[in-house]
C-alpha cells in the first residue's frame, strides 16, 4: 500500500480501525492501508546486498544494475528512538533505484499503541511521470536468533510516478519488534530485508537489444496480441527465411502483405529500437476500427498464414507453411453392430485443447482423442443400415514440426450469454512426448517436442494485456516480449508462472495465464531454428527497405525543419483562362507551381531562384502577391522588387503560409527576342483585368490585363477591349465593375477618369464588358450583372437514392432561389421521370443519412433547405421514386411487415395504406403487392409476432393508428388456408405453434396457426404439421411436442394424447395472460444470428 494515501485516510473522521497486532498474519491483499511519499534523507542505517535468489541465467551483463532481482538489507540503528521515516541507500534492479522505507505509525484513537511501517520505494527521485515497473517483493524483518522466525509479507504492485512506494503501514506491532525476547532487536538495531523481482520497466531508457539481443514491437492499440504472434512467427526461423525469399519486387508498398511482413522481420532482425506494425496492418486493408478490435490469436494466425501461403504459390518457397505447420488426422465413425465405418482425413494447422476440468496438457490430449458413444437419441445414420449405435473419434496420423496448441481459455457461458475466461490452473511441460496419441509411431523419429513459445493473457474476456515468452534458440534461455520491452526471464517465469489458477504466491496473478503454446519437434529443432544471416536476405529486398528508410528519414527531417520554411504558390496567367466565377481563378481547381522557401531568405534571392526555375530573365517577370481584400475578394497587388528586395519572405507575406503570387511574364513568343515587361509606375499607374461576357452562351472569356494611367478615361479603354474580344472597332459596349460576389456595378459614364468611374480604384480591379446588342434581351441571363447574381445563388447539390445504402448519388447544379417544384422538375429530368413521382428528404444534421420527408407543398426555397450545411460541406438531399403521385402518397403511411408466401417463405415488404385507414385497407394494399396462391382462400390476415411466437391476430376493422411499430415485435401478413376460413367454435380452435430447443424461451423459426379438433388423436395433428413444414419422416421422428403455458412446458405422449381444447385456453381468471401454445422441440439447423456487435466481426485480411 502506498503510505501517503494511508496517512490521508487516517485523517478522515470515522476511518476504519487498523489491524491490531494479533491480526498481523493477514495477507497483503487483505489490508487497505493506503500510502504516501516522503523524501526524508537517510538518518541512520546500513544497507547490505546479498545474492539471495539471483540466477546465473539472468546475469548476462557485467553491470549488475540491470539485473531482474536482488535481495538487500537495511539495518536501522537506535530503533527505539525512531520518530520519522528513514530511507535506505538505493539498490539498483532493472537500472531503477529501490529503497527500503521504515517509519513508526501512530494512531489518534490509540495513542499508546503504534506499529512499524515497512515499504518498498522505487524511483522516487525521478522527475519523469511516464515510467512504470511491475514488481513482486518479499518484505522481511530479520530475527537474529532464528531466521526461520523472521516475519515476512509479500507484495505485488505496479510502481509508477503517483504510487512509487508500496508496503504496510502496520507491518508489525512496535511492541513485538522492540521486545528483546522476540529476537527482532539486538543492541537497539533492527534489520529489514527485501527480495524484489522486477519486470523490465516501461517509459524509461531500457535498451532491449543490449540486454537480450532482441527488440520489441510497438503497441498499436488493441492488436497487442498481434505483437505476440509476430514475435512467435519471427523466431520460427525457417519461416522467416522463406518470407524473405518471396518475390516482392513489383508489389505495391502499401498493399502487399508479404512485403510488409518482410519489412517487420527485417527490422526486428536489424533495428536497435522497437519496430512499428502500422504498415503491416495497413497492408491487411484494415479500416481504422479494425486495428483496435480484440480478436482471437488463433484467428489472426490462421488468416495471416493462409494469406502468405497463397502468395507463396508458384515461388521457390511454395509449400513452406504446410511443411512447417500442417499435420494430418482422421475422423472416424465405427458402427458397433454392423460392418460400417466412415473415415475422413483432414489437415490441421493448430489443435484446440479443452482445459476446463483438465489438470494438464496430457489430459487435454486424452480428451481430444477420446471415443464418443453414439447411442440412444444420438445414434448414427448409417445409410442403408439405418440408425446405428457407433463410436466416434479422431486419431492423429502425423504431427507437424511446429505444433501450435490453442488453449481454450475463452468459452461461451449460456447463463450470462457471453464469453468468459477460464483462469483454472493448467500445466504444460517444457518437453512434451506425444507418441501415445499417434496412430502409428516412428521409432527413428519419436514425437518429442520442445516448448518454444508461451503466449500469455492478463485480464478478463473484456480486455487485458498480452505478452509472449520465447525460447529463441531452443536452449532453455527464455525472454519475455512485452510489446516494446524485451527482457530475460527465468524458465519458471516463462512456464510455471503461466499455468494460471489460484496461488498463495502473489508473484503469480490469478488472471495471468497461457492461452497458446508453440512446441517444436526435437528432431526438427535445428532445422526450424536454423540461423538466419544477412546472406539469407535478397539484396534487392535489402536495398528497397533501406531506400524506404532513407526516404522516411528525409521526410522526418523535413517535418522537423518545416518551421523554417514556407510555401510560395505561383499562379500563372494561363490559369485565369476559362474561369467562370468571381475573381481570377477557383482556388480549389487552380494548379500552382509550389516553391519551398526559407522564411528568412530575401525577396531578391527568391526572384533569382524563380527566374532560373521558370526560364525567364528577371526583367521579363513581375510578382503580384494575391491580397485578400476586406470585401472577401482576392486580387493581385503590387510588389516592388527594388524597394523590397532585401526584405525577408515571411515579412513580405505578413506570415501568410502558403503565400500565393501571380507571376506576370513576357509573352513567351516575344521572350526569345529579348522583350521586357513595360515599366509600371506604382504611384500613377494601375493594373486592370478584363473579362468579356457572352449572353448567348452565358459564359465569361478572360481578356488579359492592362497597365493604364489612373487619369485615363474609361472611353480610352474601349478600343483595347474590342481588340482583346475580337470585336470590330467602335462596337458599342456595356461595362461593369466586378466588385465582389453578388455585387456587380454598371459603369455609366465613360468620359470620367478611372479613379472616379471605379469604386476605390486599386491594382487588380476587374472590368467586365459585353456587346450592347438588343438580341441579348432574349437570353436567359442578358447582362453580366444577372449572370453574377445567378452565379452567387448557384449551388451544387448531391441527390442520393434513399432506398440504396451508401448511394454516391449524382450532382445537380441549382439556384438556391428555386422552390420545391423547380427542384423536383430539374431532378426528374435527370432521372427521366415525372416530378410528381419523386419524394425528397432533408439530410440529417448529426449524421450522414436521410431525415424527415419534404411535403410537396413546401413553401421555402432551396436555400432554406441547405441553410444548416457548413460553407464547404457538400450539400446533400435524398429522394425516392414513387409508384404513385406524391399528392396521394403523402396521405399514406409506410408500413413494414413480413409476407409469408404459399411456399412458407418469409420476405420483408413495405406497404402504403391510407394513414387513417384500418387493417382491412392494409390487407387490400398487400393484395396488390404480392402474388396469392392458386389453391387458397384469397383472404389475408395480419398477425403480430414477438420472440418468434404469434401473440395475436388483428381484426380487420382495427385502426392502423393503434399498431405502433417496435423493434421487439413484427407484423406478418399471410393468406388464410382454406381449412381455417370457417372454424366451428364449439369443437375447433386455431392454436399458435412455435419452435424451440430444450428451453421454451429460446424460440426460433417461423411460427404458424394450426386448426385442431376436439378429441382428435394427436397423431393426426402431427401429420398436418409434417405436411405443412414439408419435413422428411426420418427428421420428423426427432421432434418432441409440448403444451407451453406461462413459460412452462409439458411434453405430450404422442401415442395416447387426444386433443382437449381446454388445454389451449387461458386459465380461468387470467384472461389477460397469453394463451397456451404448442411447442415443437427440435434442433435449430438454421444459422444462428451473430451474438456480437460490429466491434466483434470476424477478422479479415483484404489484400
From Swiss-Prot:
The keyword Glycoprotein does not apply. One of its GO terms (molecular function) is K48-linked deubiquitinase activity. Keywords: Acetylation, Biological rhythms, Chromosome, Cytoplasm, Developmental protein, DNA damage, DNA repair, Hydrolase, Isopeptide bond, Nucleus, Phosphoprotein, Protease, Thiol protease, Ubl conjugation, Ubl conjugation pathway. The keyword Cell division does not apply. GO terms for biological process: DNA alkylation repair; monoubiquitinated protein deubiquitination; negative regulation of gluconeogenesis; protein deubiquitination; protein stabilization; proteolysis; regulation of circadian rhythm; regulation of DNA-binding transcription factor activity. Residues 20-32 have a biased composition (Acidic residues). It catalyses: Thiol-dependent hydrolysis of ester, thioester, amide, peptide and isopeptide bonds formed by the C-terminal Gly of ubiquitin (a 76-residue protein attached to proteins as an intracellular targeting signal). It is found in: Nucleus; Cytoplasm; Nucleus, PML body; Chromosome. The active site is at 224 (nucleophile), 465 (proton acceptor). It is an enzyme of class 3 (hydrolase). There is a cross-link at residue 870 (Glycyl lysine isopeptide (Lys-Gly) (interchain with G-Cter in ubiquitin)). The modification N6-acetyllysine is found at residues 870, 1085, 1097. There is a cross-link at residues 870, 883 (Glycyl lysine isopeptide (Lys-Gly) (interchain with G-Cter in SUMO2)). Monomer. Homodimer. Part of a complex with DAXX, MDM2, RASSF1 and USP7. Part of a complex with DAXX, MDM2 and USP7. Interacts with MDM2; the interaction is independent of p53/TP53. Interacts with DAXX; the interaction is direct and independent of MDM2 and p53/TP53. Component of a complex composed of KMT2E, OGT and USP7; the complex stabilizes KMT2E, preventing KMT2E ubiquitination and proteasomal-mediated degradation. Interacts (via MATH domain) with KMT2E. Interacts with OGT. The C-terminus plays a role in its oligomerization. Hydrolase that deubiquitinates target proteins such as ARMC5, FOXO4, DEPTOR, KAT5, p53/TP53, MDM2, ERCC6, DNMT1, UHRF1, PTEN, KMT2E/MLL5 and DAXX. Together with DAXX, prevents MDM2 self-ubiquitination and enhances the E3 ligase activity of MDM2 towards p53/TP53, thereby promoting p53/TP53 ubiquitination and proteasomal degradation. Deubiquitinates p53/TP53, preventing degradation of p53/TP53, and enhances p53/TP53-dependent transcription regulation, cell growth repression and apoptosis. This is Ubiquitin carboxyl-terminal hydrolase 7. It comes from Mus musculus. The gene is Usp7.
Amino acid at each position: 500500500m502506498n503510505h501517503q494515501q494511508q496517512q490521508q485516510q487516517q485523517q478522515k473522521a470515522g476511518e476504519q480501525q487498523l489491524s491490531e497486532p494479533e491480526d498481523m498474519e493477514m495477507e497483503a491483499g487483505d489490508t487497505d492501508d493506503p500510502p504516501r511519499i516522503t523524501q526524508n534523507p537517510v538518518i541512520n542505517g546500513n544497507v547490505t546486498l546479498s545474492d539471495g535468489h539471483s540466477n546465473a541465467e539472468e546475469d548476462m551483463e557485467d553491470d549488475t544494475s540491470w539485473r531482474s532481482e536482488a535481495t538487500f538489507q537495511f539495518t536501522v540503528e537506535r530503533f527505539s528512538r525512531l520518530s520519522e521515516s528513514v530511507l535506505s541507500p538505493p539498490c539498483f534492479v532493472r537500472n531503477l533505484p529501490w529503497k527500503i522505507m521504515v517509519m513508526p505509525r501512530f494512531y489518534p484513537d490509540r495513542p499508546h499503541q503504534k506499529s512499524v511501517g515497512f515499504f518498498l520505494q522505487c524511483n522516487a527521485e525521478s522527475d519523469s511521470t511516464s515510467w512504470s515497473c511491475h514488481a513482486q517483493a518479499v518484505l522481511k524483518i530479520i530475527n537474529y536468533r532464528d531466521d526461520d522466525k523472521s516475519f515476512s509479507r509479500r507484495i505485488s504492485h505496479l510502481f509508477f510516478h503517483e504510487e512509487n512506494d508500496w508496503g504496510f503501514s502496520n507491518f508489525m506491532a512496535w511492541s513485538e519488534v522492540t521486545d528483546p525476547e522476540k529476537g527482532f532487536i539486538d543492541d537497539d538495531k533492527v534489520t529489514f530485508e527485501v527480495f524484489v523481482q522486477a519486470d523490465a520497466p516501461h517509459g524509461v531508457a531500457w535498451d532491449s537489444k543490449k540486454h537480450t539481443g532482441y527488440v520489441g514491437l510497438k503497441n498499436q492499440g488493441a492488436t497487442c496480441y498481434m505483437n505476440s504472434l509476430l514475435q512467435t512467427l519471427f523466431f520460427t526461423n525457417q519461416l522467416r527465411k522463406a518470407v524473405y525469399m518471396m518475390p516482392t519486387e513489383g508489389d505495391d508498398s502499401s498493399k502487399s502483405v508479404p512485403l510488409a511482413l518482410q519489412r517487420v522481420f527485417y527490422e526486428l532482425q536489424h533495428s536497435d529500437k522497437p519496430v512499428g506494425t502500422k504498415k503491416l496492418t495497413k497492408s491487411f486493408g484494415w479500416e481504422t476500427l479494425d486495428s483496435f478490435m480484440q480478436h482471437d490469436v488463433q484467428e489472426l494466425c490462421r488468416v495471416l498464414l493462409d494469406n502468405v501461403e497463397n502468395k507463396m504459390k508458384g515461388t521457390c518457397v511454395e509449400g513452406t507453411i504446410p511443411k512447417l505447420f500442417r499435420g494430418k488426422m482422421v475422423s472416424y465413425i465405427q458402427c458397433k453392430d454392423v460392418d460400417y465405418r466412415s473415415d475422413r482425413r483432414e489437415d490441421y494447422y493448430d489443435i484446440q485443447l479443452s482445459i476446463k476440468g483438465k489438470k494438464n496438457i496430457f489430459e487435454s490430449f486424452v480428451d481430444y482423442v477420446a471415443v464418443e458413444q453414439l447411442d440412444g437419441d444420438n445414434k448414427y445414420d448409417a445409410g442403408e443400415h439405418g440408425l446405428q449405435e457407433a463410436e466416434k473419434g479422431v486419431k492423429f496420423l502425423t504431427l507437424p514440426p511446429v505444433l501450435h496448441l490453442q488453449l481454450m481459455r475463452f468459452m461461451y457461458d449460456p447463463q450470462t450469454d457471453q464469453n468468459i475466461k477460464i483462469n483454472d490452473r493448467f500445466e504444460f511441460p517444457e518437453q512434451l512426448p506425444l507418441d501415445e496419441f499417434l496412430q502409428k509411431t516412428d521409432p527413428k523419429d519419436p514425437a518429442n517436442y520442445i516448448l518454444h513459445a508461451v503466449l500469455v493473457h492478463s485480464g478478463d474476456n473484456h480486455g487485458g494485456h498480452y505478452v509472449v515468452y520465447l525460447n529463441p534458440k531452443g536452449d532453455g534461455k527464455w525472454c519475455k516480449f512485452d510489446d516494446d520491452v524485451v527482457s530475460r526471464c527465468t524458465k519458471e517465469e516463462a512456464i510455471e508462472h503461466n499455468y494460471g489458477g489460484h496461488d498463495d504466491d502473489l508473484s503469480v496473478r490469478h488472471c495471468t495465464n497461457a492461452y497458446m503454446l508453440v512446441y517444436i519437434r526435437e528432431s526438427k529443432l535445428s532445422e526450424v531454428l536454423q540461423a538466419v544471416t544477412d546472406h539469407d536476405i535478397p539484396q534487392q529486398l535489402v536495398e528497397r527497405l533501406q531506400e524506404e528508410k532513407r526516404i522516411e528519414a528525409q521526410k522526418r527531417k523535413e517535418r522537423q525543419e518545416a518551421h523554417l520554411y514556407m510555401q510560395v504558390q505561383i499562379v500563372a496567367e494561363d490559369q485565369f483562362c476559362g474561369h467562370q466565377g468571381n475573381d481570377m481563378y477557383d482556388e480549389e481547381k487552380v494548379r500552382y507551381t509550389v516553391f519551398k522557401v526559407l522564411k528568412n531568405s530575401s525577396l531578391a534571392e527568391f526572384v533569382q531562384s524563380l527566374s532560373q526555375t521558370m526560364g525567364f530573365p528577371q526583367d521579363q517577370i513581375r510578382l503580384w502577391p494575391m491580397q485578400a481584400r476586406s470585401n472577401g475578394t482576392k486580387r493581385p497587388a503590387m510588389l516592388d522588387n527594388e524597394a523590397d528586395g532585401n526584405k525577408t519572405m515571411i515579412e513580405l507575406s505578413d506570415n501568410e503560409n502558403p503565400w500565393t503570387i501571380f507571376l506576370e511574364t513576357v509573352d513567351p513568343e516575344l521572350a526569345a527576342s529579348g522583350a521586357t515587361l513595360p515599366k509600371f509606375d506604382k504611384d500613377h499607374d494601375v493594373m486592370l483585368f478584363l473579362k468579356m461576357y457572352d449572353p448567348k452562351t452565358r459564359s465569361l472569356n478572360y481578356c488579359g490585363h492592362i497597365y493604364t494611367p489612373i487619369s485615363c478615361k474609361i472611353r480610352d479603354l474601349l478600343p483595347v477591349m474590342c481588340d482583346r474580344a475580337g470585336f470590330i472597332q467602335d462596337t458599342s459596349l456595356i461595362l461593369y465593375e466586378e466588385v465582389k460576389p453578388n455585387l456587380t456595378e454598371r459603369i455609366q459614364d465613360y468620359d470620367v477618369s478611372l479613379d472616379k468611374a471605379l469604386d476605390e480604384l486599386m491594382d487588380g480591379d476587374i472590368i467586365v464588358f459585353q456587346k450592347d446588342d438588343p438580341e441579348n434581351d432574349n437570353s436567359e441571363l442578358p447582362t453580366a450583372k444577372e449572370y453574377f447574381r445567378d452565379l452567387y445563388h448557384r449551388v451544387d447539390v448531391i441527390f442520393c437514392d434513399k432506398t440504396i445504402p451508401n448511394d454516391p448519388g449524382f450532382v445537380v447544379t441549382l439556384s438556391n432561389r428555386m422552390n420545391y417544384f423547380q427542384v423536383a422538375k430539374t431532378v426528374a429530368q435527370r432521372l427521366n421521370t415525372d416530378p410528381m413521382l419523386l419524394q425528397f428528404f432533408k439530410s440529417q444534421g448529426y449524421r450522414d443519412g436521410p431525415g424527415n420527408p419534404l411535403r410537396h407543398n413546401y413553401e421555402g426555397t432551396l436555400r432554406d433547405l441547405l441553410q444548416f450545411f457548413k460553407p464547404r460541406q457538400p450539400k446533400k438531399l435524398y429522394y425516392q421514386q414513387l409508384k404513385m403521385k406524391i399528392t396521394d402518397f403523402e396521405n399514406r403511411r409506410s408500413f413494414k411487415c413480413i409476407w409469408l408466401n404459399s411456399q412458407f417463405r418469409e420476405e420483408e415488404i413495405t406497404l402504403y395504406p391510407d394513414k387513417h385507414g384500418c387493417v382491412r385497407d392494409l390487407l387490400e394494399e398487400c393484395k396488390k403487392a404480392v402474388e396469392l396462391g392458386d389453391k387458397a382462400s384469397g383472404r389475408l390476415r395480419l398477425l403480430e409476432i414477438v420472440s418468434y411466437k404469434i401473440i395475436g391476430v388483428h381484426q380487420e376493422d382495427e385502426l392502423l393508428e393503434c399498431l405502433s411499430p417496435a423493434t421487439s415485435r413484427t407484423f406478418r401478413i399471410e393468406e388464410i388456408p382454406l381449412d381455417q376460413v370457417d372454424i366451428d367454435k364449439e369443437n375447433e380452435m386455431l392454436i399458435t405453434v412455435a419452435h424451440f430447443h430444450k428451453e421454451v424461451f429460446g424460440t426460433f423459426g417461423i411460427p404458424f396457426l394450426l386448426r385442431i379438433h376436439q378429441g382428435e388423436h394427436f397423431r393426426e395433428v402431427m401429420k398436418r404439421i409434417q405436411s405443412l413444414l414439408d419435413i422428411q419422416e426420418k427428421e420428423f421422428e426427432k421432434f418432441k411436442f409440448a403444451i407451453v403455458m406461462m413459460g412452462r412446458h409439458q411434453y405430450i405422449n404422442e401415442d395416447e394424447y387426444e386433443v382437449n381444447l381446454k388445454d389451449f385456453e387461458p386459465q380461468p381468471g387470467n384472461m389477460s395472460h397469453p394463451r397456451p401454445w404448442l411447442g415443437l422441440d427440435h434442433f435449430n439447423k438454421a444459422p444462428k444470428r451473430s451474438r456480437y456487435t460490429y466491434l466483434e466481426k470476424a477478422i479479415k485480411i483484404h489484400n
